[in-house]
Swiss-Prot record:
Entry keyword Cell membrane: yes
Protein's recorded name: Probable potassium transport system protein Kup
Cell compartments where the protein resides: Cell inner membrane
Main location, first listed in the record: membrane
Residues making up the signal peptide according to the UniProt record: none
GO MF, one example: potassium ion transmembrane transporter activity
Annotated Pfam families: K_trans (PF02705), K_trans_C (PF22776)
UniProt cross-references to InterPro entries, sorted A to Z: K+_transporter, K_trans_C, K_trans_N, Kup
Organism: Acidovorax ebreus (strain TPSY) (Diaphorobacter sp. (strain TPSY))
Annotated transmembrane regions: 8-28, 50-70, 100-120, 137-157, 169-189, 203-223, 247-267, 285-305, 337-357, 366-386, 392-412, 419-439
GO CC terms in record: plasma membrane
Reaction equations catalysed: K(+)(in) + H(+)(in) = K(+)(out) + H(+)(out)
Length: 622
C-alpha cells in the first residue's frame, strides 16, 4: 500500500510538471488580455462577470469535458487526438464513407496541433520575460532578444534529451502553482467579496447583459485553457487518477486563487490592468518571479515540444508523413526521442512568430482559432466513440457532446474575429502540415497501386524458381515489400545481377495498425511458402517502437532459425517520377516526389544493422 501511495504521488507530481505546465502559465496573460482589449468597460460588475466567466470556462472545458468525459476514452491506456481518432475509426469501421470522413477530420485536427505548438511557447516565454518591463520600463528593448535566447537554448538542448532535467519539471511547476496561489491570497483577503464571482449567476448576468462584448472577449477568455488538450494527450504517461488528482488538488485551486487575486487587485487598483499578474507581487519579488515564470514557461514549452516529437512519430507510423530521422535520447526510456527536422522547423516558426508579433498581446490575437477548432474536433470524435464504440443511447450522447459542442463552437466563432489580427498564422501552419499529410497519404496509395500493377505473384514466381533453381548461398535473406504476396523488386534485381538465392528467404511486410500497442504474441504472422521461404507480416501499433531484427527473432521455433551474422536485408529504393494524369494535381505529384526523395532510409527507421543492408533502386512513374 505504501509503495502504491508513493507511486501515485510520484505520478501526480510528474503530471503537474508535464500536463499542467502550459495551463499553469496562462495566468501570465489571460486576465490582462480580457481587460486590455478595451472591449470591456471597467466596472466592478464587469470584473465579477469576467472572473466568473474565466472560472466557469475552466470548470466546463477542463474539469467536465476533459477530466471527467474525455479521459474515459482511453485507447489501451493511451490518449491524445490520434488515439481518439483510432477509437472513432474502429467504432464506425463498418461505415467506410463515415470512417474516411472522420479520418480526414482527425488528421486535420492533428495538423492544427502544430499551429498551436508554434504560438503557445512564443506567447508563454514572451509574457514571462515581459515581467521585466514591470521591474523597469528600460528593460523593454531586451524582452525580444532575451526571449529568442531562451527559446534557442531550449531547442538546442533537445538532442540531449530530457532524462536529466525532466525530474525537476514536477517540483519546479509545483513551486510555481504554490507561488501563484500565494500571490493571490493577500489580495483576496483584502477584498473577500470577490469570491462571490464563483457563483455562475455573475457569468450568466455578464453574458446576457453584454452579449456582443461577451462574444468578442471569448477570444481572450480561451487563453485560460491553453494546454487543456494536454490532459488527454499525456494519459498514457501518467494515467487517469494522477492527472485528475493533480488537477483538482493543485492546478485548479491555484489557478482559481490567482485569477481571483488578479480580480481583487483590479477592484482596488484599476491601473494594474496593464499587467495584473506581475503587479500583484511586491517589488522585491519581481525579479525572482520573472525567473520562476521563465522556468515554468520553458517547462511548459518543453512538454509541447516532446509532444510534437511523439505525435509526429505516430503520424509517420500511421502513414501520413514520410519517414524522418528519429534519434533515441535515452537508453532506458524508449519513448524519449528527438526529431531534428521537427525540432528546428518548430524553432524557426516560433522565432518568426516572436519577431512578427513582437509582444504577448499581439500573439494573443493569433492564439485560439487552431486550439478551439481542435477542441471542436475532439468533441465530434468523442460523440462517435461513446455512441458507436460504447453503445450509449443516442439521446444521452447528443445531450452530453452537444452541450460541449455548443461551448466549443462559441469559443471558435469568437476567435474567428481574430483571423486577420493573427489567427491566420497558426491556421496557415496547420493547413500546410495537413497538405503535406494528405499529399503523402495519397501519393503512397498511388505508388502502391502502381507497384501492384507491375508486380508478379510471389507463389507463381517461387514455383518458376523451383523449376529452374538458381545457385543457393548460405545465410538468410530478408526482402521487404509494401504488399504481401507479390515479388519484391529487390529480389528481382538481386536475381538479375547476382543470380543467386539464399538458403532461407523471408518476404516481410510491415503493417501499422490504428491501435497504440500490439503485443509480442501478435507481432508476427508467418506463412510457409515451401523451399525454405516464408511470408512474414510484422504488426506494429502507432506507439510501438520499431525494431525489425528483434521482431524477426520471434521466428525461432517456427522452422526458420535466423543467425544475426548471416542475415542480409534487401531493400528497394523507389525513385518516384511524376507524370500527368495520375490522380493528383501536378504540384502535389512533384511535392510527393520530393518528400519521397527526402524521406529517411528504411534501414534506420526499422533499426536494421547498417552492415547487413543491401539497397537496390528502381524508377516508378505515378
Amino acid at each position: 500500500m505504501q509503495t502504491s501511495k508513493s507511486s501515485l504521488a510520484a505520478l501526480t507530481l510528474g503530471a503537474i510538471g508535464v500536463v499542467y505546465g502550459d495551463i499553469g502559465t496562462s495566468v501570465l496573460y489571460a486576465v490582462k488580455e480580457v481587460f486590455g482589449s478595451g472591449h470591456v468597460p471597467f466596472t466592478h460588475a464587469n470584473v465579477y462577470g469576467v472572473l466568473s466567466v474565466l472560472f466557469w470556462t475552466l470548470t466546463v472545458i477542463v474539469s467536465l469535458k476533459y477530466v471527467v468525459l474525455v479521459l474515459r476514452a482511453d485507447n489501451h491506456g493511451e490518449g491524445g487526438l490520434i488515439a481518439m481518432l483510432a477509437l472513432a475509426s474502429q467504432a464506425v469501421k463498418d461505415r467506410p464513407r463515415l470512417r474516411g470522413w472522420l479520418l480526414g477530420l482527425g488528421i486535420f485536427g492533428t495538423s492544427l496541433f502544430y499551429g498551436d505548438g508554434v504560438i503557445t511557447p512564443a506567447i508563454s516565454v514572451l509574457s514571462a520575460i515581459e515581467g521585466l518591463e514591470v521591474v523597469s520600463p528600460h528593460f523593454g528593448k531586451a524582452v525580444i532578444p532575451l526571449t529568442l535566447v531562451v527559446l534557442f537554448g531550449l531547442f538546442a538542448v533537445q538532442k540531449r534529451g530530457t532524462a536529466g532535467v525532466g525530474r525537476y519539471f514536477g517540483p519546479v511547476t509545483l513551486v510555481w502553482f504554490f507561488t501563484i496561489a500565494a500571490l493571490g491570497v493577500p489580495h483576496i483577503v483584502g477584498h473577500p467579496e470577490i469570491l462571490g464571482a464563483l457563483s455562475p449567476h455573475h457569468a450568466l448576468g455578464f453574458i446576457l447583459g453584454n452579449p456582443g462584448i461577451s462574444f468578442i472577449i471569448l477570444g481572450a477568455v480561451v487563453l485560460c485553457v491553453t494546454g487543456a488538450e494536454a490532459l488527454y494527450a499525456d494519459l498514457g504517461h501518467f494515467g487517469k487518477r494522477p492527472i485528475r488528482l493533480a488537477w483538482f488538488s493543485v492546478a485548479m485551486p491555484a489557478l482559481t486563487i490567482n485569477y481571483f487575486g488578479q480580480g481583487a487587485l483590479l477592484l482596488a487598483e484599476p491601473s494594474a490592468v496593464k499587467n495584473p499578474f506581475y503587479m500583484m507581487a511586491p517589488d522585491w519579488a519581481l525579479v525572482p518571479l520573472v525567473v520562476l515564470a521563465t522556468m515554468a514557461t520553458v517547462i511548459a514549452s518543453q512538454a509541447l515540444i516532446t509532444g510534437a516529437f511523439s505525435v509526429t512519430k505516430q503520424v509517420i507510423q500511421l502513414g501520413y508523413l514520410p519517414r524522418l530521422n528519429i534519434q533515441h535520447t535515452s537508453v532506458r526510456e524508449t519513448g524519449q526521442i528527438y526529431l531534428p527536422f521537427v525540432n528546428w522547423s518548430l524553432f524557426v516558426a516560433i522565432v518568426l512568430a516572436v519577431v512578427m508579433f513582437r509582444n504577448s498581446s499581439n500573439l494573443a490575437a493569433a492564439y485560439g482559432i487552431a486550439v478551439t477548432l481542435d477542441m471542436l474536433i475532439t468533441t465530434v470524435l468523442t460523440f462517435f466513440v461513446i455512441r458507436y464504440g460504447w453503445g450509449y443511447p443516442l439521446a444521452l450522447c447528443v445531450a452530453t457532446t452537444g452541450f460541449f459542442f455548443v461551448v466549443d463552437l462559441a469559443f471558435f466563432s469568437s476567435n474567428l474575429l481574430k483571423l486577420l489580427q493573427g489567427g491566420w498564422f497558426p491556421l496557415m501552419i496547420g493547413g500546410l502540415v495537413f497538405t503535406l499529410m494528405m499529399t503523402w497519404k495519397r501519393g503512397r496509395e498511388l505508388l502502391n497501386d502502381k507497384l501492384r500493377e507491375d508486380s508478379i505473384g510471389l507463389q507463381d514466381f517461387l514455383a518458376s524458381v523451383q523449376a529452374n533453381p538458381p545457385m543457393r548461398v548460405d545465410g538468410t535473406a530478408v526482402f521487404l515489400s509494401a504488399e504481401a504476396g507479390v515479388v519484391p523488386n529487390a529480389l528481382l534485381h538481386n536475381l538479375k545481377h547476382n543470380k543467386v538465392l539464399h538458403r532461407q528467404n523471408l518476404f516481410v511486410t510491415v503493417r501499422y495498425h490504428e491501435t497504440p500497442w500490439i503485443g509480442l504474441d501478435q507481432r508476427l504472422q508467418v506463412a510457409p511458402l515451401g523451399g525454405d521461404c516464408w511470408q512474414v507480416t510484422v504488426n506494429y501499433g502507432f506507439k510501438n517502437e520499431l525494431d525489425l531484427p528483434s521482431a524477426l527473432r520471434l521466428m525461432h521455433g517456427r522452422g526458420c532459425e535466423l543467425e544475426t551474422m548471416s542475415t542480409s536485408y534487401f531493400l528497394s529504393r523507389d525513385v518516384v517520377v511524376p507524370t500527368i494524369g495520375s490522380g493528383m494535381a501536378p504540384w502535389r505529384e512533384k511535392l510527393f516526389a520530393q518528400m519521397h526523395h527526402n524521406a529517411s532510409g528504411v534501414a534506420a527507421f526499422l533499426h536494421l544493422p547498417s552492415n547487413a543492408v543491401v539497397e537496390l533502386g528502381s524508377k516508378v512513374e505515378i
